[in-house]
Amino acid sequence: MKRPLVVITAGFVLGEVLALCLQETVYRKCFWFAGALFLAALIARHFLGKDQDRYLGRDQNRDLAGNSGRSVTYRILLLIFMFIFSGMAAGSFLGVQSRNQMDREEDRIAQAEFGDVVQLTGQVMDVREKSEKLEIIVNKVKIQWLTLQFPVQLYGVPGELENWEESLLPGKKVKIACSLNLAESEKNPGEFNAKLYYRSKGVVCTGYIKALKESWGADRPFMRVILRFRKYCSRILEQYCEKEDSSIYKAVLLGDTSFMEADTLDLYRSSGIAHLLAVSGQHLSLIGGGIYLLLRKTIGGFKAAGILGGSFVISYGIFTGSGGSAVRAVLMICCLWLAAERGRTYDSLSALGFAALSLLGKNPYLIFHSGFQLSFSAVLAISGPGQWMIREFNIGKNWKKIVVISLWVQIILLPVMAWHYYQYPLYGMFLNFLVLPFVAFLMLSGIMILLTGGFWPFAAETAANVGHVILVYYKWICGCSMKLPGAVRITGRPGPGQIMGYIVVWGIGIAALKWLMGRKLKGQRRAVFAAVVLIISVLIGFTILSPRPVKGFELLCLDVGQGDGFLLRSGRTSILIDGGSSDKKKLGSRTLEPCLKSKGISRLDMAIVSHGDNDHISGLLYLLEQKMPIDILILPAGGKGGDIYGKLEQMQAEAGGRTYYMHQGDRIKAGEMEFTCIFEKETEKERNAHSLVLCTHYKDLHMLFTGDMGISEETELLKMTEIKGSIQQEHLKHVQILKTAHHGSKGSSSPGFLGKMPLKAAFISYGKDNSYGHPSPAVTEQMKKQNISFYETGGNGAWILENKDRKVIIKRAKTSVPAN
């Protein structure tokens, strides 16, 4: 059996994922079910062994050892199952152990109830100077009576920490006054999951340094040299390169993207060439491989060159921050040199499996890190189907090899990118074909800057100019690709079923290619058939991962902090009602935009603004700045002529959309949803007072969105309901779901107003620990008296209402992978 380590790794990864994602009772059932299947196979093998001649035809097709072909196949399958089950057992054991340990650590810290500032002592593991901050990992942490099992990641501002370059060296013990926070999971779909991210780094809690109290003990000389050399390299790059160029060089050579401008980083990601910014095997092959060959020529022998070269690449991996991609590359290149020294054949897939087991055995949560998944998936694509196709189809020309490798890398990375970034660069493969030939020259120019910058300015400036030309070309080609139609396809976050369907499609596609290899076809004809198989598989795969239309109706009450934000969807129709916050300053970029992308929404059919306060429009302003397509922007008629509404109208026009000022009595239909304005004080210029009050209905489900209307507006609305046949009377008597006005303020939601409707549930959107006292206890108590179920955000996360087959369900919105 070939590559047993690869099979064991597959089982190991499966076991860890099940252990970390599923509830303990569920994953145990999966594990025991797999064990029962394995045991059944062993029993069947034992009792059917005597009769295999009759059932398997052993007398007809025997190998040299006397075994039939079917019997050998059976044994191989049994062996594969055994390796997978063994790996799964080990992976699930480590996964459960890691999850339980981190959960216990969190519980201990949460129960300790430390103050806003704590005195922390521990030993510095690593220090990295980022763009405007320091990142310090502290191990062996003790806070008062509590000793932590896991490291703490602290952040600080260099200018505020006196003599930090000497006091915070790795190995030194420190006493620090800092805040301490447990990392939190995302509150809304698509948001960054800080809890999962820090767990992938082996960290449970973070903090911000207030003061560096004391530092003592000896540092680690090797790490001191690494840190000082990293700072020297950073200074040299800043000295000889333009600001944008130096930031890219720091990412490529030093493994630090924090200095890059957000627009530049987003351009590389959206274009599909962000992998150039990660320290990978290509870096180590060029740098470490060059040194290895030089050592082979100078000192001779595989062993000495391998030891010295291995020491260098390990040091370089530490130098770049020991990220998953860098460690993977270090382990694989060391395997390559070890194989050369032993005179054995190097197998990249087995080396990849060894690297995965080494990293995941130390920290199972690393499996969820986007960098880890992208790095390992890319190498899997190159070493697996890419090399197989090159070998089987006898592809000899280098440009053809690059095309095949690029194609398979994009195929394998598609579901990974869709899961983490909710989008896919449609022209990424072609762009990589145009930029990859210059990567080596870019790296060599950066290395020359570092080598000559200290003593030969002319050479460093020349190298910087060469690199500048390449980077200008990269920026230009990326800009051109982004202007092409459909350059970035919004995929949304695919579900597990979609990903499995994608894997099945490509499994069938590879099987079809293997079948094609067995046919006696001439080279050109075979290539045409292979191209047809690939094109069909690509089209079907894209279709499977495309966003699914909503079945029935879905309302998402976002946790936007102190503000409002609701997303309504039915079929392929998407409506945003408000979208702002007074305490989340980057609501648009960190919450609203990721949420829409994760749902596969690239355009909004309609955006409705109840009124122009910042806590209702800040995120929407960001979307308009980004020129997100919004077909119709609805504004309250009472705000016409106001500065903020004029700004919204202008931005909507620049984005290519229409604006409509809604009056009382207006009705708008969008898909199967209908919106009726039942109250709007057109003559009132005070924003809260002229809030749009919308009755929204989908089939038999009726909802009321109230903006920030107060009790006086509620009283006026109630008077209108006394008029027989009025729209107010007609709509309020059917309302089942309420968006509580003004975040649950005591100045809204009067008992008479709540009692006028047959309410079943209400959403209250507010910020945790807000200074306004929202929601008012009087409001929540009144809802309890009237048997109205209310669902609060308040930092606890988004809520989702689903209406399918006339059944209404309200539940917590699904996020990504649960951390516990």
Where are the model-predicted features located?
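N-terminal leader/targeting segments
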Residues: M1-D107, R328, L516
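Hydrophobic alpha-helical transmembrane segments in multi-pass membrane proteins
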Residues: R3, V7, G15, G207, ...
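Aromatic-rich juxtamembrane segments at the membrane interface
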Residues: A10, S200-M332, W337-L338, L556, ...
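Membrane-interface helix/helix-cap signal primarily in integral membrane proteins
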Residues: F83-H275, R590-P594, R603, G638-K640, ...
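Core dinuclear metal-dependent hydrolase active-site scaffold
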Residues: L360-F368, G479-M606, A653-I737, G795-N820
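Metallo-beta-lactamase
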Residues: L604-D615, L624, G638, L738-H742
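Active-site HxH/HxHxD metal-binding segment of metal-dependent hydrolases
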Residues: N614-Q652, L759
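Cap/insert and terminal regions of metallo-dependent hydrolase folds
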Residues: I632, E716-G797
